[in-house]
Design a protein with these regions (language model features):
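Flexible mid-to-C-terminal extensions adjoining Fe-S/redox cofactors in radical SAM and related proteins
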Residues: 57-120
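Radical SAM enzyme [4Fe-4S]-AdoMet core and its adjacent flexible, acidic
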Residues: 1-64, 103
Length: 120
């Protein structure tokens, strides 16, 4: 009753979990399913216009607008920032969405306004 929408992420392959990483083809298939769910009215908080960037991992990282507190340590974006090369494999949808938003991507801006006004 209190959940208004869900948000999805891909696995970010930390050194001890690389085998869980998805291929580009698997990411595309996941995004197709999520997009279909959205089309059918499922309450999904992700931005469809960010999917191509997520599939190809071609969005700016790290997200300087996001901070994470974990085990008493404050990190820009998340603890993955401390692992060399991991940002380039980021699976966090919010990172793509926010970095593209703050870079002025018009599609992202429009869709974020529409989505956030719908669920917040």
């Amino acid at each position: 009753k209190n959940v208004r929408a869900v948000s999805f992420n891909f696995h970010t392959p930390y050194p001890d979990t690389r085998e869980l990483a998805l291929s580009k083809e698997e990411k595309a298939a996941c995004c197709d399913v999520i997009a279909q769910m959205m089309k059918e009215g499922a309450p999904v908080f992700n931005l469809k216009s960010a999917f191509p960037y997520l599939i190809e991992n071609r969005f700016p990282t790290p997200c300087h607008q996001c901070v994470v507190m974990e085990n008493g340590k404050l990190s820009t974006c998340g603890r993955c920032i401390d692992v060399p090369g991991l940002c380039e494999q980021c699976g966090y949808f919010f990172v793509a969405e926010y970095t593209l938003l703050f870079r002025g991507n018009p599609k992202i801006i429009f869709e974020m306004l529409r989505t956030y006004l719908k669920y917040i």
